[in-house]
């Protein structure tokens, strides 16, 4: 039986904050000609919208109503991919440290997870997509044909995040940034609904001492091998 869907396979990339999922997903999608669905950005857009609307992170009824009226889409802008919330470009606003921490809390609420789960499944059902997040291979698409779990040490992830913030002109110390990475890990791993964990059939990749190109080549080779198996099926 073929393992390839109408437009190709579904590739799930999970892992903790700062592991390099977004950068690698964008590059891999470009190489394969696949669509990149940034689920983390979707949750961040909900968190930003909730903050703006004055909805508390534990207000399930308010969050459910917010999600019903929220349209999250992605638009290509040259090499970049913009995130739109009800037509507004929020690509920059959702990437602050404050929204990042709020996202970990908001994304643990069941109404938010359910609303975005349905949205993500519709986006990726026909294959030819790469989704990255924290529970893609375990909850969103447990039947994804290719799964990766990308990780790196907290120190390395904090260092990468610190450099990102510095490049954007945001003030933070390396120690503070690493501490926030550890805090985010604790929140993501300990939440009740869909905690961060590696799928049993995922390919684990520790990128602490690997270059982006080395990780990218490993991922591309794995996907192409799976596609070849599907062609034979």
From Swiss-Prot:
InterPro entries in the cross-refs: Cytidylate_kin (IPR003136), Cytidylate_kinase_dom (IPR011994), P-loop_NTPase (IPR027417)
Superkingdom of source: Bacteria
Binding-site list for ATP: 15-23
EC number assigned by the record: 2.7.4.25
GO annotation terms (biological process): nucleobase-containing small molecule interconversion; pyrimidine nucleotide metabolic process
Catalytic activity of the protein: CMP + ATP = CDP + ADP; dCMP + ATP = dCDP + ADP
Stretches for region Disordered: 183-203
Alphabetized CDD domains for the sequence: CMPK
Main location: cytoplasm
GO molecular function: ATP binding; CMP kinase activity; dCMP kinase activity
SUPFAM superfamilies in UniProt: P-loop containing nucleoside triphosphate hydrolases
GO cellular component, one term: cytosol
Biased composition annotated in UniProt, kind: Basic and acidic residues: 183-200
Keywords: ATP-binding, Cytoplasm, Kinase, Nucleotide-binding, Transferase
Enzyme class: transferase
Subcellular location: Cytoplasm
NCBIfam families recorded: cmk
PANTHER family per record: CYTIDYLATE KINASE, CYTIDYLATE KINASE/PANTOATE-BETA-ALANINE LIGASE
HAMAP family given in the database record: Cytidyl_kinase_type1
Family note: Belongs to the cytidylate kinase family. Type 1 subfamily.
Protein name as it appears in the record: Cytidylate kinase
């Amino acid at each position: 039986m073929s393992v390839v869907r109408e437009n190709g396979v579904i590739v799930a990339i999970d892992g903790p904050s700062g592991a390099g999922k977004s950068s690698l997903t964008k590059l891999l999608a470009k190489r394969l000609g696949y669509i990149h669905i940034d689920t983390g950005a979707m949750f961040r857009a909900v968190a930003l919208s909730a903050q703006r609307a004055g909805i508390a992170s534990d207000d399930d009824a308010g969050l459910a109503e917010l999600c019903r009226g929220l349209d999250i889409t992605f638009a290509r802008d040259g090499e970049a991919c913009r995130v739109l919330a009800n037509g507004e470009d929020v690509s920059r606003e959702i990437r602050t440290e404050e929204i990042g921490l709020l996202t970990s809390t908001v994304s643990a609420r069941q109404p938010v997870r359910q609303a975005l789960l349905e949205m993500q499944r519709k986006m990726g059902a026909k294959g030819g997509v790469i989704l990255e997040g924290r529970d893609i291979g375990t909850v969103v698409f447990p039947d994804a044909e290719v799964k990766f779990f990308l990780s790196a040490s907290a120190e390395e992830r904090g260092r990468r995040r610190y450099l990102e913030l510095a490049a954007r002109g945001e003030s933070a110390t390396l120690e503070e940034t690493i501490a926030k990475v550890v805090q985010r890990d604790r929140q993501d791993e300990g939440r009740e609904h869909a905690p961060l964990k590696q799928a049993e059939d995922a390919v684990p990749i520790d990128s602490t001492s690997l270059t982006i190109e080395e990780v990218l080549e490993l991922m591309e080779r794995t996907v192409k091998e799976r596609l070849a198996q599907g062609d034979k099926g």
